[in-house]
Amino acid sequence: MEIFKTCFLMVVLMLLFVFVGGYVGGQQGMIIAFLVALGMNFFSYFFSDKLVLKRYNAVEVSKKNAKGLYAIVRRLSQNAGLPMPKVYIIPERAPNAFATGRNPSHAAVAVTEGLLNLLNENEIEGVLAHELSHVRHYDILTGSIAAVMAGAIAMLANFAKFGAASGSNRNTQKGNAAIMLIIALIMPLAATIIQMAISREREYKADKGAALLTGHPEWLESALNKLENYSNSYTMQNASPQSAHMFIINPFGDIKNTLSTLFRTHPSTSDRIAELKKIGMQLKNR
């Protein structure tokens, strides 16, 4: 299913580029846009993880300089039957975490310094189990490509604005200019919808996977509660909207108002905690 989602995202990206390229530059623009889209798809598949890690200044660590963290990841990976991923720490005081990579053999998990300082060992294990569940379900490739795609859509919106402006200046393509302006306005919404489509359900799925992997859903439950309380006071300083869906909680804080809730990339933390409580009851009744 995740492979299908990944292919779908790549096709959508290509079609968007070709469509906008055709309006801006005709047949030649379509060809150029097609080649650019091919290049971006190739880049997204092989390098999206590196781009995201670099975006957040993540530093790779080993068992020598992060013994406790490394040991938790190794133990969970073995229990999940996964290859050992690379482990990164992000120099950021806001607590958060994400996983990235194109498959379990090329995966990485990253946590912020703030998360390590805020949570106890059991809670950290719950968070890392959540991230490794993303790895096991192949969510990481889809999420990484979606992050690059959201950035590409933002770039396309700028191209569309340029096309609208140039068309209106020539006074010969007013219809095309109007269409391009509409595209420029709806593309940011399209990027958000794409992030929503791949994020909400997979967070519940990863929460459940973490609960089953550790056997202690209360660990992740406690971690999410702390993360939400802290994130509403301290949001990530260099967080990017294009990659917000990758984190275990929204790096911009939990959204409360009704309108914004419709476009949130994460389920509400209270709903996630409620689901974890249900899983906990099911485990006790076995």
UniProtKB/Swiss-Prot annotation:
Binds 1 zinc ion per subunit. One of its GO terms (cellular component) is plasma membrane. Its EC number is 3.4.24.-. Its cofactor is Zn(2+). One of its GO terms (biological process) is proteolysis. It is found in: Cell inner membrane. Gene3D superfamilies: Metalloproteases ('zincins'), catalytic domain (3.30.2010.10). The chain crosses the membrane at residues 6-26, 28-48, 140-160, 178-198. It comes from the Bacteria. Zn(2+) binds at H130, H134, E203. This is Protease HtpX homolog.
